[in-house]
Amino acid sequence: TLTTDLLNQCVSSSFAMRSLKVPHVGIFCACAGFVCGMALAASLVDAGFARRAVVGASSHHDAAERQYRFPTELGVQRPPTAQWTVTGAGAVVIAGGETPGPIQITHATFGRVWDLGLKDPYDMGSAMVPAAADTLLRHLNDTGRNVDAYDWILTGDLGRVGSRILIDWLKDRHGVHI
């Protein structure tokens, strides 16, 4: 089992796994945790180290606010650039087999850290744009594909502002239209 959550030490995931008595890896990479877990699980299954792997993710709005921004009890006004962390959870089973199914993980491209010096905790989307653009461009280059090969291109926590910047960044700097 590979799990991720938005709290330090993946404490929510670890508490949930206590009673299951199965191998467990906690993944801490914020909003990328779920997709990172899927890529790692697919690698484990593909290499024959596991027949199946469960990947789970959870988050809680107020816990994320307290850790990343400001405790909600402070009553800080949220600016329009602020993302809204969901309170929710989800899980998938990654499995190999003789016959590939209609949904497959065939490639994974891990991102690199980019730090352009943005410091606003309420505008993390803008701060993540360079890394998101770099990861997408490297993925397209590595796989020899273009954006038309995909039904959807999804990112983590860019929000409305960061998503708009990413679209413009890719179009203006690289001629890539998403």
Stretches found by the model and what they are:
Residues 5-8, 31-32, 57-63, 111:
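Acidic, glycine-rich active-site loops and adjacent beta-strand->loop/helix elements
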Residues 28-55, 94:
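Active-site-proximal alpha-helical scaffold in enzymes
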Residues 70-137, 142:
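Condensing-enzyme catalytic core mediating Claisen C-C bond formation in acyl metabolism
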Residues 47-57, 100-103, 142, 173-178:
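Structural signature of cysteine-dependent C-C bond-forming condensing enzymes
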Residues 10-22, 45-47, 68-77, 170-175:
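A glycine- and small-aliphatic-rich helix-loop capping segment at beta-alpha/alpha-beta transitions
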